[in-house]
């Protein structure tokens, strides 16, 4: 199941052994869970007042695990490149410590020096008998105009159909 909402039906599905890709709409994450973190493609290292849209960045970009099978069909290096532009503009940060501090994300958002939160963009866990893959990027809105979102969605859903989808952490 691919969903942008964690409702009672989705939780029941997970507890009974289902697989869920949770891809919330931009802005849908509560402040306590990371919603206060504003993402942008340029990092705060650069003077973002000079950027075209005066984006309000918060973080230093992302670090990925390019060898992780979830990204097998989404070409990437260990750091942010232009294929991540769309994800950063449509993404939500998730505070991993609020879920389980042991989670090692597939894609980590590098926080700034003021908060130094452990932030995830893509991570996985077990819930009951089921498995959840959380992608903080809204992969469902305006898909026909977002090639990168379609490809990332394809990569993640393909991964979920393999035996490699085997989260280590239970939440």
Predicted features, each with a name:
Residues 165-171:
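Short, intrinsically disordered, charge-balanced linker/junction segments flanking boundaries
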Residues 29-32, 42, 47-145, 168:
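Catalytic beta-strand/loop cores that center a nucleophilic Ser/Cys/Thr
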Residues 1-45, 129, 133-135, 156-159, ...:
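Short alpha-beta junction capping motif
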Residues 148-160:
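Short amphipathic C-terminal alpha-helix that caps PH/PH-like domains
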């Amino acid at each position: 199941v691919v969903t942008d909402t964690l409702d009672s039906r989705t939780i029941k599905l997970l507890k009974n052994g289902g697989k869920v890709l949770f891809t919330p709409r931009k802005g849908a994450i509560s402040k306590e869970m990371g919603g206060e973190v504003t993402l942008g493609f340029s990092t705060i290292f650069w003077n973002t007042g000079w950027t075209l849209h005066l984006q309000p960045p918060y973080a230093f970009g992302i670090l990925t695990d390019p060898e992780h099978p979830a990204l097998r069909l989404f070409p990437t290096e260990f750091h942010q490149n232009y294929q991540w532009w769309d994800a950063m503009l449509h993404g939500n940060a998730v505070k991993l410590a609020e879920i389980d501090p042991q989670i090692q994300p597939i894609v980590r958002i590098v926080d700034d020096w003021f908060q130094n939160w452990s932030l995830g963009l893509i991570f996985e866990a077990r819930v009951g008998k089921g498995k959840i893959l959380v992608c903080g990027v809204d992969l469902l809105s305006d898909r026909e105009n977002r090639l990168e979102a379609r490809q990332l969605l394809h990569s993640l859903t393909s991964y979920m159909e393999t035996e490699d989808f085997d989260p280590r952490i239970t939440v």
